């Protein structure tokens, strides 16, 4: 019997949204009795943008903004086509990007 794995990666700028989406998927997995490993928190990507406050003069006066990307990773063992179809139809919170990979 060939073992199939489904890897899901969640990304968002808000860590609460990522955690809600992961929780929703894990509830579905426990209802369908699917074995999984995770959620594994992946490193947070931090981007800093520096812009001038004034358009004209005052080069030393600058403002910095930060954007963080939070990521989580889950692997499902032998998910089955029914579970994959349920996941595809599941609505995730707005602002969460979900990536599927079947191995």
UniProtKB/Swiss-Prot annotation:
Q: Does the keyword Ribonucleoprotein apply?
A: yes
Gene3D superfamilies under this entry? Answer: Ribosomal protein S10 domain
> According to its record, what are the GO cellular component terms?
ribonucleoprotein complex; ribosome
Q: What does the protein in this record do?
A: Involved in the binding of tRNA to the ribosomes.
What the record says about family reads: Belongs to the universal ribosomal protein uS10 family.
Oligomeric state and partners?
Part of the 30S ribosomal subunit.
Q: What HAMAP family has UniProt attached to this entry?
A: Ribosomal_uS10
Task: Return the protein name.
Answer: Small ribosomal subunit protein uS10
């Amino acid at each position: 019997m060939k073992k199939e794995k489904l890897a899901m990666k969640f990304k968002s700028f808000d860590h609460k949204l990522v955690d809600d989406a992961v929780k929703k998927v894990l509830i579905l997995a426990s209802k369908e009795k699917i074995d999984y490993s995770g959620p594994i928190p992946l490193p947070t990507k931090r981007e800093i943008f520096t812009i001038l406050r004034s358009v004209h003069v005052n080069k030393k006066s600058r403002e910095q903004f930060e954007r963080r990307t939070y990521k989580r990773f889950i692997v499902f063992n032998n998910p089955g086509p029914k579970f994959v179809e349920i996941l595809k139809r599941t609505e995730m919170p707005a602002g969460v990007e979900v990536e599927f990979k079947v191995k």
